[in-house]
Amino acid sequence: MREIIHLQTGQCGNQVGCKFWETISGEHGIDQTGRYVGTSDNQLERINVYYNEASSKKYVPRAVLIDLEPGTMDAVRQGPFGELFRPDNFVFGQSGAGNNWAKGHYTEGAELIDSVMDVVRKEAESSDCLQGFQITHSLGGGTGAGMGTLLLSKIREDFPDRMICTFSVVPSPKVSDTVVEPYNATLSIHQLVENADETFCIDNEALYDICFRTLKLNNPGYGDLNHLVSLVMSGVTTCLRFPGQLNADLRKLAVNMIPFPRLHFFVAGFAPLIAIGTQKFKTYSVSELTQQMFDSKNMMTACDPRKGRYLTVAAMFRGKISMKDVDEQMSMVQSKNSSLFVEWIPSNVKTAVCDIAPTGLEMSATFVGNTTSIQELFKRISDQFTVMFRRKAFLHWYTGEGMDEMEFSEAESNMNDLLSEYQQYQDATIEDAEEFLVN
């Protein structure tokens, strides 16, 4: 089977990751101890992608849990699904990274990385035909950002031909945890551009907006945000976990979604987004799902797709839905909003349908877009970075761990290059496209 090894690093990465395992265990009929209690053969047909079948019919996640301090790990162990994970796959330090990217990447993280890679290799060896890795982490902290990107480069070194996909939580000024987030995020994006194959950008600001506006929550906590992220992760990985045709592995998804290797940062969305407790009172049609899914208010990334253009889009519908309805609705969206799709990639919207609906819903749709409007998000981080870096504010925390100012300048210019690449393709017409293809 085409296995995927899941790595979660840092506090945010571990919390989001655990929610993901809770969600997909529910969908595959796996209980909290790893026993199968489901009812459908489809649940087991591709279970080996994410789970290893151990002795006595216990299903164990192919997950490695990493942190530079023991607190989050203890919380995971004591949580509802703590017994699901293999005890040897918890790898943690004692010192923490103190929200410092340099500690995660160069000092504390570098000391722990060999033990992490040993576990990763062991998981890879127990795979039959490994397709790749997925990482959940945040870009604003020390461990998820610094050590997460160190892990990324080590995996790229050891497994050069496997796919690496990241679910990266991007910091936002409205929901700020630390003042040095713009530094940590810019240094991380510098690494993601070079080493990741696919990055789903999840944005705390957008998640909070969804909680307030759509779900009508007065005081959303991280639990609510992580629930939203797990909906998207479950939707995005549906094609990998259940029998289906389109985008059935990480590489096919990448081939459909990434026209230029550096532009692999995706916006994700989900429909229906409904307040908890109201799902029983409403059924949705395919057209409502499609409209919601393309609505910027449903995007988990704080950028407005109407301000840019879509290079490519993938949509995953779930539930008892006719393929014909889906195709009709999707082509309607495209013809109504034709100016939002670049015309030089002819069939740039791909659709998949999976019979198995997510738990508690009759049908759902997950949206993945490669849109040039994501430059808003990079621009926001880059502007904050520049303001601080010009004054060299807080730099001593990084140089004290052995980093060089040069590395900051390189990360800044890589970010600026990325912005201008997105802008170039946003403005491009069919005539220009012929030039790209010639180059």
Swiss-Prot record:
Keywords: Cytoplasm, Cytoskeleton, GTP-binding, Magnesium, Metal-binding, Microtubule, Nucleotide-binding. Coiled coil: none annotated. InterPro entries: Beta-tubulin_BS (IPR013838), Beta_tubulin (IPR002453), Tub_FtsZ_C (IPR008280), Tubulin (IPR000217), Tubulin/FtsZ-like_C (IPR037103), Tubulin/FtsZ_2-layer-sand-dom (IPR018316), Tubulin/FtsZ_GTPase_sf (IPR036525), Tubulin_C (IPR023123). The keyword DNA damage does not apply. Its main location: cytoplasm. Its cofactor is Mg(2+). Mg(2+) binds at residue 69. GO terms for molecular function: GTP binding; GTPase activity; metal ion binding; structural constituent of cytoskeleton. GTP binds at residues 11, 69, 138, 142-144, 204, 226. It holds the Pfam family Tubulin_C. GO terms for cellular component: cytoplasm; microtubule. One of its GO terms (biological process) is microtubule-based process. It is found in: Cytoplasm, Cytoskeleton. Disulfide bonds: none annotated. Belongs to the tubulin family. Dimer of alpha and beta chains. A typical microtubule is a hollow water-filled tube with an outer diameter of 25 nm and an inner diameter of 15 nM. Alpha-beta heterodimers associate head-to-tail to form protofilaments running lengthwise along the microtubule wall with the beta-tubulin subunit facing the microtubule plus end conferring a structural polarity. Microtubules usually have 13 protofilaments but different protofilament numbers can be found in some organisms and specialized cells. Tubulin is the major constituent of microtubules, a cylinder consisting of laterally associated linear protofilaments composed of alpha- and beta-tubulin heterodimers. Microtubules grow by the addition of GTP-tubulin dimers to the microtubule end, where a stabilizing cap forms. Below the cap, tubulin dimers are in GDP-bound state, owing to GTPase activity of alpha-tubulin. PANTHER family: TUBULIN (PTHR11588). This is Tubulin beta chain. It comes from Encephalitozoon cuniculi (strain GB-M1) (Microsporidian parasite).
